[in-house]
Each structure stands twice: as structure tokens, then as C-alpha cells.
Amino acid sequence: MERVGFVGLGIMGARMAANLARAGYALTVHNRTRSRAQAFAQEHGATLAETPAEVGAGSDVVITMVVDGGQVEEVLLGEEGVTQGAAEGTMCVDMSTIAPSDTRRIGAALHERGIGFVDAPVTGSSPKAEDGTLTIMAGGSEADFERARPMLEVMGELIVHVGELGQGQTVKLINNAVAASNASTLAQALIVGKATGVDLGALIRIMGAGSGASTMLTLKAEPMRTHDYSTLFKLEHMLKDVRLCLEETQAAGVPFPAAAHTGEVLAAAMGRGLGDVDFAAIVEVLEGLADTRL
């Protein structure tokens, strides 16, 4: 088995790394908040690294699950980054969601050092990370993907090699923009139902049985209806992903009006201080526009 390093033990990362530990991989872990990494190491028998460079020195494959491209670059290429300790032939797998252009740039720098790179962002919330049933879309060479596959299969249920380096990120961003737009449309539908006196339970059942069915309906209708924004995926992270998707559409010269509108609504929710709660809180802004409370 490859020795695996894991950097980024947040809501998703800790659960993903735990599945690798349970599968028998020898883990070296690092987290910006040291106490999280220390607790994880004690619980799962992992080695605690003080810096990403130490992770690189003790690993054949290094997985990153952090917030944005700046963090990925710092973790992999910074003064105390993975490349400061990693040997030639090491491979890095970034499972964060970042700009495809950042992925390609970081990948080029790694390849100059003889280090492979795969971008493998995920879809699915923390329960799926816990169960190892995430959907993973991977970009990179066929050889690098096949090397990463055994570890990805521990963390995910559906693993798809979508193309060259960076295309995993592109697919993920499009998917999340669709999900966010769907959630916004769902919130609007519930508000219309409330304003017109419709029984919301009946509306949700009918939509779920017909052409209005969606994953967002299943996951977010009741939280929106009850204003329960327990965090499965932070609103600020969804806004980041939608904005990154819109950067891609602008570069390609194509419109994505649904995502553009949803980005504005998410930004308004951020302005209300809702960034740290679940993106189901998008309903708060739309309730305000309609002057109707679910």
C-alpha cells in the first residue's frame, strides 16, 4: 500500500481521511489548526506532521482538501510546502474545489519537480464523506488517475476520469452552479406556494413524484421550510464555487444566466451574515424579496 499524506481535516477532509485509515493506509496528517490534526492522529493511529513538508517527506501520495487555490498552492508549493519534503515520483491529489486555471498552473509547477498531479473534487455532503459514498470527478493523465484510483475508491462510490488536468474542477463547478440554481428555484417555489395558500407538504410530495423532483428538493425543502440551516455545505463555499464557474463561462464566452442570478442571491445572503451556515439559507433572501415567510 502507498503511504498517504492528508492535508486539510475540516468537515469533509476528516471524514475522508478516516475512511483511508480504516482501509489500512498508513496516514501522515496535517491541518492548519493543529488540534484537529492531533485529535485525528490519536483517534486513527496516524502520524502528526507539523508542516506540509513533513507530510511530503513521509508520503508516496499526498491528498489535499482545503478551501481555495491559494491554500492549495501554499500547501504544495510554499516555503514549508509538500514539495520541500517530497521525493521525485511522489503524487499529489487535490480534492479541494478551486479554479481550473489554478489547478493547471500548480500542476505544471509540480511536474517540473517530477511530481504527479490529479485534481479530484467531490460532490456529496458530510454524510456521504462519512460513508465513503462521494462522487469524485478526476482530471489528469491516465497513469496518474490509475495510481490514485484505489484511494479514491475508498472515499467515493462513483469515480469518473473526466479528462485532462483541470477538467475535474470544471465539471465540479458546473455541477455546483446547477445545484445552487436548483436550490434557489426550489426556495422560490416554496415561497410562491406559501403566498398562494398551498399546503407546502403536499407541494413537496407532488414535486418529488413528478418532473419537479431533484436532489435539492430531497435535501433542502424541509430545511428551508423549517429554517434549519445546520451546515452540510457552507453558503460561502457555494458562493465561491458559483463565482468560479462564472469565471469559466466568461473565459469561454458563453452565458450562464441562472448561475449569475443565483450568485447575486448568495452574495446577498453573505451580506446578511449567513456565510457559515448551510446554503439552504438562500431562502432568507428570497423570503425578503417576496415579503413572505415560510
Segment roles from a protein language model:
Residues 4, 92, 97-177:
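Rossmann-fold dinucleotide-binding core
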